[in-house]
Amino acid sequence: MKLFIYNFLFLFKRNRYFYYKTSGTNYRYTHPEYFQELLSAISNNVNKKELSETFQNFLSKKVYVFGRKVDIVFNMDFFNNFKFRNNVKKPAFFNKADVKVPYEIGRLQFLQKVMLHNFLEDNQNPELNFDLLDEIITSENNKIIWNSPMDVAIRMISLIFVKNFINKIDYVNEPSLFTNLDSVISKDFEFVKMNYEKRGNVVGNHYFVELASSLLFIANYDYEDKELDLESTIDEISKEIELQFNKELTNFEGSSHYAALMT
């Protein structure tokens, strides 16, 4: 009975996510000043072989996930050969498959390496195919990638950096190549805001990553309530730093990467 109630409440909550409709707010991208400094910093310390491998895999619609090269598909656990249906009853693991596999693919973090590789190469490849963005924005059959607000937040971060790169690579300035990019990013932003995980047992890292992704969006887009969102987001981030960290910067995560993000 306890498991039944747990599954019902989880499913009810996630169904609210699935049927979310965007607000219709007009978001206008403004290329941020930070990106040139960021690009200069990372361009001098990259593994070009790894970037090239990631790029070639992407051209073949492949990506490495937890050490295994798999297809870029957003509703599969390839390790257990399991395809997720629209309704997933448990948040992470259950007896047939691991939902973290499609979560990891849906984060789209590999796109940052794809774009960096293309930026650094003298002979840039104009054959990049971002049809997967269409699949995300019309993801009726892949609702699993809307199952975790934190993972949606990470996807938004990845796509914002793709947007940043577009403005630095000459041949991708054609709007037709990325007609849905702003729509995907803004949909992710509104979804994350509506589903902040500020309560429950994942408040720590989940909530802060969601706040950080919102702050990155605010730095890249102009819209009517931008100043209000900026003030409230910075206020919440400040509160979370106070709550989650000791004076010597240790915290419950025990992660140096997480500490760097928070501070």
Annotate each predicted stretch with a short phrase:
Residues 96-263:
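Aromatic-lined, polymer-binding surfaces characteristic
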Residues 3, 26-33, 37, 46-50, ...:
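Alpha-helix boundary/N-cap detector
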Residues 11-15, 44-45, 195-198:
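Surface-exposed polar/charged interaction patches
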Residues 11, 28, 33, 37, ...:
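Low-complexity, Ser/Thr/Pro/Gly-enriched N-terminal "stalk/linker" regions
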Residues 33-50, 116-129:
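Amphipathic repeat-derived elements
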Residues 1-37, 41:
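Membrane-proximal basic amphipathic "stem/tether" segments
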Residues 4, 37-41, 54, 58, ...:
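Charge-rich, solvent-exposed alpha-helical interaction surfaces
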